[in-house]
Structure formats: C-alpha cells, structure tokens
Curated annotation (Swiss-Prot):
Positions that bind Ca(2+) 1: 768, 771, 799-800, 908
Residues with the Phosphoserine modification: 240
Gene3D superfamilies for the chain: Calcium-transporting ATPase, cytoplasmic domain N, Calcium-transporting ATPase, cytoplasmic transduction domain A, Calcium-transporting ATPase, transmembrane domain, HAD superfamily/HAD-like
EC number of this enzyme: 7.2.2.10
GO cellular component: endomembrane system; endoplasmic reticulum; endoplasmic reticulum membrane; membrane; sarcoplasmic reticulum; sarcoplasmic reticulum membrane; synapse
Name recorded for this polypeptide: Calcium-transporting ATPase sarcoplasmic/endoplasmic reticulum type
Organism per entry: Drosophila melanogaster
Keyword Acetylation: no
Highest rank taxon of the organism: Eukaryota
Family: Belongs to the cation transport ATPase (P-type) (TC 3.A.3) family.
Coiled-coil regions, chain positions: none
Lineage of producing organism: Eukaryota, Metazoa, Ecdysozoa, Arthropoda, Hexapoda
UniProt xrefs under InterPro entries: ATPase_P-typ_cation-transptr_C, ATPase_P-typ_cation-transptr_N, ATPase_P-typ_cyto_dom_N, ATPase_P-typ_P_site, ATPase_P-typ_TM_dom_sf, ATPase_P-typ_transduc_dom_A_sf, HAD-like_sf, HAD_sf
C-alpha cells in the first residue's frame, strides 16, 4: 500500500478489507500470502568457496604469473635429469605465492560481514495478530504476517512489518527508530492521517516501521507493507543494486597490469626473435627445437623479472600497518584498499548528530524573572558551560560566574528538573564516560540541576559516580514523587505530583511540577515566580517570555526550549482520573511560571579546528542531517561550515527544496552546497551519485540501517561505532568514538600512506626495470645467463620486499594537510619520473650484466676470456681455434651469476635509500630517519648471505661464496646508483624551483669526481 501515512484509519482498513475488531478471514490471508509473498527479506546467495578462489585469480598480474608458472612447469619436464630438481623450484615457488595470495583473499572475504545479511537480525521471529479464525490475540511466525493483518504491539516488541496505527491504548506510544533514522530520541506516534504524500520517514508519525522497537506504550495497527515492500526491505533492494567500485589504487594497478602485459609480450617476442639465428648453435645440439625452447625459457625468465611479485604482499602489509595506526586514532578500517582512497578524499559528507555534535543534549542558556512591576519586567539570563552528560560546568550571569544557591528561583527550578523527570545519568566504568538512561531531554535537565547545585551540596571526597547524583539525592530527601502524568500530544507537557518529606521554601503542601512546550505551559500559567514571591502573569508578560523564548529558538543557537512551572495547590489525587490522559490538561491549571531552559546537542569542541584543517587541505565538508533546517544551519555556523553572518542561499537545502529542483539544478546544488537538512536515505545516495559524476572522491558517514546504501555507494563509507551492525558492515571504516575529527586524522594518515606507497611502488618498478634490462642485454649481446628465474623470484619477493615494506614507515611530510587532495586519476608515474626510473633501471641492468662479464673477462679467479669468446659462448662446444684451451663448462660457473645477483641485491638496497624521498637528497633526509629501512636492509643482506653460504640453498639458487676482491667489485658497480639518483633529484629540485639545472651544479660534479678519484686509486 503506497502512501499509507496519508490515508485515514478507515481508508487503510478498507483498502485491505480488514475488520477493525476481528481482522482478516482465512481466505483473505491465503489470498494475500499468494499475492504478496512471505514477510521476510530474501536470503543473499553467498558465493561458494570455489567461486571465491577463482575470483582471486581474476587479476591480470596474477594471470601473467600463473601463465609463467605453467610454462615453467612444462619446460621443467624437458630438463636434463640432473637439473630436474632446480627446474621445478621456479614454478613451485610461483604457485606457492599464488596459493598464499588466494588463501588470504578468500579468508578476508569469508570473514567480511555481509551488510545485506546483517539486515536479517532486525526481523522478529514472532508477531501478535488478530484474525477471524480464533478469538483474541494469537502469536504467529512473523514471516506468515500478510498486508491487511491486524497486529498488536507493546513495550519491548520488535515491529514485524510496516504498520499503519489504528488505535493507541496507552497515554503515549514511543518508538525507537534509531536503526532507521540514526536519531537516538524515541518518536511519539499518533493515529491521525498525514496529508503530505511526500513526507519523509521521520515525519510519518502514524507508521510503525518493520524492525524498530516499542519503547513505551501499546497499540494496534493494520499491516501495509511486508518483506521487500517495507522501509527496511527497500533499503535491502537498494543495497543489492549497489555495485562495488574499485578504489583509485586498484584502478591504477589494473592499468599498470595491462601496460605491463603489453610491454612483457613485446619484449619477450623481441628477445626470442633476436636470437632466432642462435637456435641451431652447437650448445643446443644443432637442434632448432631445443634452441627455440632454450630462448623461450629466457623469455619466460624475462616475464618473471618484469612482474613485481612482491607488490601485492607489500601493498597489503603497508595498508595493514596503516590500519593499525588509524585504529590508535579511533578509526577502524574494515576494507584495506580504502586506506589509500582516504588520501584522495575531496568531499566529506558528515552526519550532524553525534559526529559533529556530542549527541548529548545540554542546557546552554536559561532565564527566570528578575523583577516584575505591572507589565514592566526584566529577566536574569544564565549561561552554562559543559557539552556532555558529565555534570561539570560553570554558571554565568552577564559574563560573571555565579553561585546558583544565591538565587531562590533556581532552587525551585532545580527541584522541577529532578522531580518532573523519569530519566537518569549513569557512569560507564568501561568507557570512563557518563551516559543517559532514558530520554536525552530529561537527562539534560538532570545534568543542569547537578551543575547548578542550588542547595550547595558538598561534593568533595565523592567519587565521580556519587558526585554526579549528589544534588538529586539532596532534592529527593525533600520530595517524594507520588505519580506522573505522562506526556501527551494535546497538552505538550508532562507533570509529577510530589509531596514534601521535610519543610522547604516551597511550602508544606503537595506540588505538581510541570515541564513542556512554552506556548502550552504559559497558556495554563496564572502567576510567575520572582524570587520567593508570586506575581500575576499578564498577557504582556507572557508575550515577553515568548519573545525571548523565540530568540533562543532562532539565530545562532536555535535552542530547544522547555518551560518549567509548578501548581502550588494542585487537585487532590482522588479527584483525578489517572487512566484517561485526555483529562490531564484539566489538572495542570493555575500554574506558576518558574523559568525557561534552552538546550541543544552541542558541537564537539575539536570540530571547529578540524573543519579549518579540511578547508586548508582542499576538502569540502557537506553536512547531511535529518534535523530541521534552522537547527542545522545554527550548528553549521557554530562549527565553521558557514560564517556567522554568511548568506546560506544556494548553499543550504532541505530535502524537499532539493527534490523540487531539476536534475541539472540538483547537480549544481551538490557542487556548491554545504548543508542538506531534513533528508531521506535516498537523498544521501543521490548526493553521492552527483559527486561521483563530478569525479569527486566522497567519504559518507552514517549510523542507521537507512544509511547503508549510501555508505556502500560512496568511495569511503564511514559508520559510527555506536551505529547499527548493518551500517558498520556496509562501511569501509568505523569511527570508534563517533567523532568527525577522527575522519580528518584518518584522511591525513591516508595521504601519508599513499605518499609512502608511491615511493615503494616506484622503487619496486625501477628494480624490475633493472632486471628486465639485465636479461634483455644478456640475450641481445649473446652473453651467458646472468640471472635465472628462481633468483629473480627471490629478489622480487624477499630482498626487495623487505625494504619496500619498510618504506611504508617513512614519516609524513609536514605540509601534508596543506595541499589539495590528489586527483583520483593522477598517475603513479609522471613523464619525468618515468625517465628517472628508466635511467636508474638501465643502470641496474647494465651493472648486473657488467658484473657477470667482469668475472669472465677481468677477474683473477675467472677464465679471463675475450669479449668475442664471451658473446659467442654457445659456439664453444663446436670446437674451433677461437675456443682453444677453454673449458666450455666455465660458462656454467656459478661465480658469474653470484656476482650479478650480489650487485643486483646491493644496488636495490641502495636504491631503497634513494626512495626515502621523491626529491629530497640523502643529506637532508638521511637513512636513519626511517630506522625500519635500515633494519630491513640489514635483514635482506643477511638473507642474501644465507643463500650464498648455506650449501643446500646455494644449490637451489645456483650461487657460490665470493672472495673479498669480488665483494669490493660488487660495491664498485653498486655505489654509482646513489650518485646517479642524487643527480636526478638535484635536477628535479631545480626544475620544481623554476631554476636552471646547471645552476649550483658544482656540488654534483665534485661528488662524481671524488667517486672516480677513489676508484682510480683502488685500481693502482
């Protein structure tokens, strides 16, 4: 049934043909079950374990590695017998990497809560219905309830379907709708039709929503929606239709994978084609097929060299470490890739209640009469400090701190706050914080009374819990509450009938303490309290009270005001009909006005500075709230979203105003607006869609079930720690303290993580370029193998992986939150950086090949071959004068490969130091600014020595121990990489400063001169 809220009770019942007393017939129930289906949310079909496993291999880099492993495995089958073991090492290692990655991926997905499944927890098991097949109320399974059923609910019940209320049996009916709206204050319901067909859920006061809870009262209603037709069902549908989007980093890595696959393909084909002339060399037994397979193996080695196998593991580790740092700042990250996405957040869409504010109502201003002479009067206006439920704060009058005990009227006001109240404050030992027990508004009045301490209670020596209830205890020794006249909509007030336990200034008889909406209470006031006297309250005085109350309710504060009054001579209890709430109005008469208190959900202290930081960082903050426009704008002025006197036209929209715009105007509104008030969940989703269409990266906060679709749709969904399970499981991040400032800290951490990630990704890529160059040069020049696939795997995974991970600990730049957010489509590598890393990579490759060639040609421990012999080594087995006296087995000697591998490892350790900063010199940013990097380099070298000096491992990796002379040569080949990168950084700094790279070049020239001078001295 559409627009059930706008229909009268009779129209709703007639729509389904429901008898208002006896409910549906069995035939109607069967027909409706067939028409509408069961009252349950469909179960989400989970993926099988094999589907999840296959998904882990749906990645281009993984597919390339898998192909390399399969080819290596096939080629290993054709190896000579003595080489069979080492030949199988490479494909096995690759497969182990892939299996480990898949296991981790599947484990993460299986453990991730499903937001859609979490919705099921709000479905009740049973419901109470009235049907014609049985007399009275019967319990049925909730899923058997159909539209048209008469359902009865009472305190503690979970609503089994969307229900149009037809009758309320109690004085009031309060419903906790926090799972849907995120607002903690329970909603008072009624049976009247709401004629507005566009009313938002918060305004549908005659509807009970499925999954919400009855906080107080008892009622009956007709079911108007079941299953997917309920408000919670529509949220489920929207969530299931929301597609997951890849993070900017995932998109960049996908692009990198595509480019890499193309480059690998071209280079592999080129290497294989270049050597076609060598296919029938004597080393291959003159067989073209064996020669083709041999060079195919080299091409596969090239593919292994080009793929940064350690990259996925390093990225995961860096992100995981980032989440630990964020957790210390109360931001719990559920989705690892979202850590990096935080770094490019350009818009934060924040809830108001509980995120920008404390979600703890607090009285900030109040007034009482100072003096009254006829129609002339003056007020005493007090201001209170403190913005939480902790009853600590000061009271000020005209900017001066005062003692409330000096004002007689404040003693009476405190008494009303305590006695006309059904709530309390409680100290949570675990959270070390005070919490409300009951309604937020009433809790604020209790805290006010404790702050006032108008009876001068001595709190010294009391613990926090006892001190927080000391004033209440004092007042309760003076008065006893006999009964309460509950709040009702017609009179908009509540009252407590109290009798004195001891004599006080208020007299010896019983009192009726009243609080409520100022207009309603003043209507029934005949007098006003001025000190200890009671004066007549004229219409002119009432107008002045309402005028000042109006000022409190508008402008910067927009306070929620309550009037406090007392009936000095109330009716006797036996003259009251306490069972009929419609008569309560008659008992709250001849009241004496005491004062008006103004309260608000105050902004968090730290939010203003966080908004300023966001502005400096180029991040726009949009406040999205279900609160009314005036209150929301007032809070936004207090926290700096709007300036004090700023015109909010075109920058602040209510949900209805937004709906009245055309799609083009809506997009323009989202582009400039900073506040959306009185919004529905679908507004949040629409705002996210518009932001995404403008290439903005949005972070969206939420805590209710209704927020889940928007949280899932936004790039960064941020749930509140106090929010629903559905919101938390739909979000990428959960704020443990519900604090907006924690989001800003998380964004800062995200930016730092991205900067560090950029450094280690570039480090790994430049290292891989070096490996590709070394294999390409070896094949192109016809040199013996310098590096084999298993060595390349070791370097990529272990030796490179450790320093790359350590680069994730680089300290953040000091100005990181003074720069605009990076664009989501910003490339990892610019043109200049590509040149830099190609230059470094080419040197790495050349030095690696050069070290192997040095051993063959120049080393005293080597064969001292000629360059021609080295480049034509495959012809050695064919004999001939050119290889006279040369043992052809020398070309398989592990020394050359060990030299190449040692140079590669050493250069890449030094290259890791180069990656401490993109442009800063090692002189200004020395290695010890990141001790993790020094430790990882030491560990990498240790592992390298292990494979050199442990026999079993040296056999697997085909390496051998090196002499002192060989180690010195390794260092000679390696150190220039630091000098080369320092030169390139110097040029980059000069270009960034707009200066000529030639300017102040003498330092760089001197650095190179010293190196070559030392090199020459060592050769003498």
């Amino acid at each position: 049934m559409e627009d059930g809220h706008s229909k009268t009770v009779e129209q709703s019942l007639n729509f389904f043909g429901t008898d208002p007393e006896r409910g549906l017939t069995l035939d109607q129930i069967k027909a409706n079950q067939k028409k509408y289906g069961p009252n349950e949310l469909p179960t989400e079909e989970g993926k099988s374990i094999w589907q999840l496993v296959l998904e882990q291999f749906d990645d281009l880099l993984v597919k390339i590695l898998l192909l390399a492993a399969i080819i290596s495995f096939v080629l290993a089958l054709f190896e000579e017998h003595e080489e069979t073991f080492t030949a199988f090492v490479e494909p096995l290692v690759i497969l182990l990497i892939l299996i480990a990655n898949a296991v981790v991926g599947v484990w993460q997905e299986r453990n991730a809560e499903s937001a859609i499944e979490a919705l099921k927890e709000y479905e009740p098991e049973m419901g109470k219905v009235v049907r014609q097949d049985k007399s009275g109320i019967q319990k049925v399974r909730a899923k058997e309830i159909v539209p048209g059923d008469l359902v009865e609910v009472s305190v503690g019940d979970k609503i089994p379907a969307d229900i149009r209320i037809t009758h309320i049996y109690s004085t009031t009916l309060r419903i906790d709708q926090s799972i849907l709206t995120g607002e903690s204050v329970s909603v008072i319901k009624h049976t009247d039709a709401i004629p507005d067909p566009r009313a938002v859920n918060q305004d549908k006061k005659n509807i009970l929503f499925s999954g919400t809870n009855v906080a107080a009262g008892k009622a009956r209603g007709v079911v108007i929606g079941t299953g997917l037709s309920t408000a919670i069902g529509k949220i489920r549908t929207e969530m299931s239709e929301t597609e997951e989007i890849k993070t900017p980093l995932q998109q960049k890595l996908d692009e990198f994978g595509e480019q890499l696959s193309k480059v690998i393909s071209v280079i592999c084909v080129a290497v294989w084609a270049i050597n076609i002339g060598h296919f029938n060399d004597p080393a291959h037994g003159g067989s073209w097929i064996k020669g083709a397979i041999y060079y195919f193996k080299i091409a596969v080695a090239l593919a292994v060299a080009a793929i940064p196998e350690g990259l996925p593991a390093v990225i995961t580790t860096c992100l995981a470490l980032g989440t630990r740092r964020m957790a210390k700042k109360n931001a719990i990250v559920r989705s690892l890739p979202s850590v990096e996405t935080l770094g490019c957040t350009s818009v934060i869409c924040s809830d108001k209640t509980g995120t920008l504010t404390t979600n703890q109502m607090s009285v900030s201003r109040m007034f009482i009469f100072d003096k009254v002479e006829g129609n002339d009067s003056s007020f005493l206006e007090f201001e209170m400090t403190g913005s939480t439920y902790e009853p600590i704060g000061e009271v000020f009058l005209n900017g001066q701190r005062i003692k409330a005990a000096d004002y007689d009227t404040l003693q009476e006001l405190s008494t009303i706050c305590i006695m006309c109240n059904d709530s309390a404050i409680d100290y949570n030992e675990f959270k070390q914080a005070f919490e409300k027990v009951g309604e937020a508004t009433e809790t604020a009045l209790i805290v006010l009374a404790e702050k006032l301490n108008s009876f001068s209670v001595n709190k010294s020596g009391l613990d926090r819990r006892s001190a927080a209830i000391a004033c209440r205890g004092e007042i309760e020794t003076k008065w006893k509450k006999e009964f309460t006249l509950e709040f009702s909509r017609d009179r908009k007030s509540m009252s407590s009938y109290c009798t004195p336990l001891k004599a006080s200034r208020l007299g010896t008889g019983p009192k009726l303490f009243v609080k409520g909406a100022p207009e309603g209470v003043l209507e029934r006031c005949t007098h006003a309290r001025v000190g200890t006297t009671k004066v007549p309250l004229t219409s002119a005085l009432k107008a002045k009270i309402l005028a000042l109350t109006g000022q409190y309710g508008t402008g910067r504060d927009t306070l929620r005001c309550l009037a406090l009054a007392v009936a000095d001579s109330p009716m006797k209890p036996d003259e009251m009909d306490l069972g009929d709430s419609t008569k309560f109005y008659q008992y709250e008469v001849n009241l004496t006005f005491v004062g008006v208190v103004g309260m608000l959900d105050p902004p968090r202290k730290e939010v203003f500075d966080s908004i300023v930081r966001c502005r400096a960082a180029g991040i726009r903050v949009i406040v999205i709230t279900g609160d009314n426009k005036a209150t929301a704008e007032a809070i936004c002025r207090r926290i700096g979203v709007f300036a004090e006197d700023e015109d909010t036209t075109g920058k602040s929209y209510s949900g209805r105003e937004f709906d009245d715009l055309s799609p083009t105007e809506q997009k323009a509104a989202v582009a400039r607006s900073r506040l959306f008030s009185r919004v529905e969940p679908q507004h949040k989703s629409k705002i996210v869609e518009f932001l995404q269409s403008m290439n903005e990266i949005s972070a969206m906060t939420g805590d209710g079930v209704n927020d889940a679709p928007a949280l899932k749709k936004a790039e960064i969904g941020i749930a509140m720690g106090s929010g629903t399970a559905v919101a938390k499981s739909a979000a990428e991040m959960v704020l443990a303290d519900d604090n907006f400032s924690s989001i800003v800290s998380a964004v800062e951490e995200g930016r730092a993580i991205y900067n560090n990630m950029k450094q280690f990704i570039r480090y790994l890529i430049s290292s891989n370029i070096g490996e590709v160059v070394s294999i390409f040069l070896t094949a192109a020049l016809g040199l013996p193998e310098a590096l084999i696939p298993v060595q390349l795997l070791w370097v990529n995974l272990v030796t490179d992986g450790l320093p790359a991970t350590a680069l994730g600990f680089n300290p953040p730049d000091l100005d990181i939150m003074e720069k605009p957010p990076r664009k989501a489509d910003e490339g990892l590598i610019s043109g200049w950086l590509f040149f830099r890393y190609m230059a470094i990579g080419f040197y790495v490759g050349a030095a690696t090949v050069g070290a192997a060639a040095w051993w063959f040609v120049f080393s005293d421990e080597g064969p001292k071959l000629s360059y021609w012999q080295l480049t034509h080594h495959l012809s050695c087995l064919g004999g001939g004068d050119e290889f006279k006296g040369v043992d052809c087995k020398i070309f398989s000697d592990p020394h050359a490969m060990t030299m190449a591998l040692s140079v590669l490892v050493t250069i890449e350790m030094l290259n890791a130091m180069n990656s401490l900063s993109e442009n800063q010199s090692l002189i200004t940013m020395p290695p010890w600014c990141n001790l993790w990097l020094i430790g990882s380099m030491a560990l990498s070298f240790t592992l390298h020595f292990v494979i050199l000096y442990v026999d079993v491992l040296s056999t697997v990796f085909q390496v051998t121990p090196l002499s002192a002379e060989e180690w010195i040569t390794v260092m000679k080949f390696s150190i220039p990489v630091v000098l080369l990168d320092e030169t390139l950084k110097f040029v980059a700094r000069k270009i960034a400063d707009g200066e000529s790279p030639i300017y102040k070049m003498h330092g760089i020239v001197l650095m190179w001169a010293v190196f070559f001078g030392l090199l020459y001295a060592m050769m003498l």
